[in-house]
Amino acid sequence: MRTNNMRGKFIVLEGLEGAGKTTAHQIILTQLKQAGIQQIVQTREPGGTPLAEKLRYLIKHEFEEPISPQAELLMLYAARAQLVENVIKPALSAGKWVLGDRHDMSSQAYQGGGRQLDVALLNSLKESVLGPFEPDLTIYLDIDPAIGLARASGCGELDRIEQQSLDFFYRTRERYLALTQHNEKAVIINAEQPLEKVTNDIQQAVQKFLTFAQ
């Protein structure tokens, strides 16, 4: 497949804690390189720039006072604005591909579903910060929250977000599914399957995307 004339594309991984995003990231990265795509910028949200990484710390850690859902949401969008304007858009304009660990769908699911913030507020912020900008492909790794959190708890200490109630994560998953089921630019992967099957499903989704991305 010819890939040297392909313009930059933005691929994003989404999913709950313990869904296997880190493993999936490496699977996709390897596949892109094997397809001849060598200029790949890797990002994560929140984070990805000096300021955004500081905001990530504020979002994920406990402080002397509770962090309100609205303050959390605004910090997430501040970090996202920095990353999109200073890293992602310049990379895409230069013909590079971007592989992201989370993007706006995370806020729609976690803050809209989990925190139950007003959808109109979320849509207004999204429009103000991102406008029509969106990933070319989103791969959502779907997993039962109880299974995902059990996996995540075995990987070290849980951060402030990961310590939310199980109901929080079930609401988040429900919103994720609502956002992805009828989204032509999104693919749902059953992350509860054996790793070999998950890997195959991810590779098939990426290959289909590459076929039409020329």
Swiss-Prot record:
GO terms for molecular function: ATP binding; dTMP kinase activity. It catalyses: dTMP + ATP = dTDP + ADP. It holds the Pfam family Thymidylate_kin. One of its GO terms (biological process) is dUDP biosynthetic process. It comes from the Bacteria. ATP binds at residues 15-22. Its EC number is 2.7.4.9. Disulfide bonds: none annotated. Keywords: ATP-binding, Kinase, Nucleotide biosynthesis, Nucleotide-binding, Transferase. The keyword Transferase applies. The keyword Magnesium does not apply. GO terms for cellular component: cytosol. Belongs to the thymidylate kinase family. Phosphorylation of dTMP to form dTDP in both de novo and salvage pathways of dTTP synthesis. HAMAP family: Thymidylate_kinase (MF_00165). This is Thymidylate kinase. It comes from Haemophilus ducreyi (strain 35000HP / ATCC 700724). The gene is tmk.
